[in-house]
Amino acid sequence: MKCPFCGDPNTQVADTRENEGGEVVRRRRRCPKCDKRFTTYERIDLKMPHIVKRNGNRSEFEHDKLAGSMKLALRKRPVTLEALDAAVDRIEAKLLALGEQEVPSEKVGELVMRELKKLDKVAYIRFASVYRNFADVDEFAEVIREVKARPKRNRPAEPPEPTSENDLFRS
């Protein structure tokens, strides 16, 4: 690998370590010419499928766009950034597991709604109202009835207090 300091192509690996999950390899390198050290990271580069929009247009999958739309739905809700990141990771893993080169945007939307429903019911309703393009209050009421009809699992009567400063946009 080429030295970022002097450009010499003959660098040497001084140390190699894997992260805990074995997903990333960290290498400490040394340049024999300028004697400077630097770190490189090696990770698997998986190709996310392209997204086919409702109008037929195709676009590349964008992690930041997915996370941003979920973050918007979760605005001022007691959900941590870690929980959001984990949900985005699960969606990406499901998309990769499909093994398809192209995935309809509807599939992505359904995966997002499924994850938001697990994270926060209000965020789920917010996202669903935009995603499903609710035309009137009756459609909101129907989704609220659907959410209320589902059994609650060990849910406290009051929303939990934020446990860290990573609670999204809590004010």
Curated annotation (Swiss-Prot):
Pfam families for the chain: ATP-cone, Zn_ribbon_NrdR
Keywords associated with the record: ATP-binding, DNA-binding, Metal-binding, Nucleotide-binding, Repressor, Transcription, Transcription regulation, Zinc, Zinc-finger
Start and end residues of each stretch annotated as Disordered: 148-171
Cofactor note: Binds 1 zinc ion.
ATP-cone domain mapped to chain residues: 49-139
One term of GO molecular function: ATP binding
Cystines in this chain: none
Cofactor list: Zn(2+)
NCBIfam families with a match to the protein in the record: transcriptional regulator NrdR
Role description: Negatively regulates transcription of bacterial ribonucleotide reductase nrd genes and operons by binding to NrdR-boxes.
Name of this chain's protein: Transcriptional repressor NrdR
Species, as recorded: Aromatoleum aromaticum (strain DSM 19018 / LMG 30748 / EbN1) (Azoarcus sp. (strain EbN1))
Lineage: Bacteria, Pseudomonadati, Pseudomonadota, Betaproteobacteria, Rhodocyclales
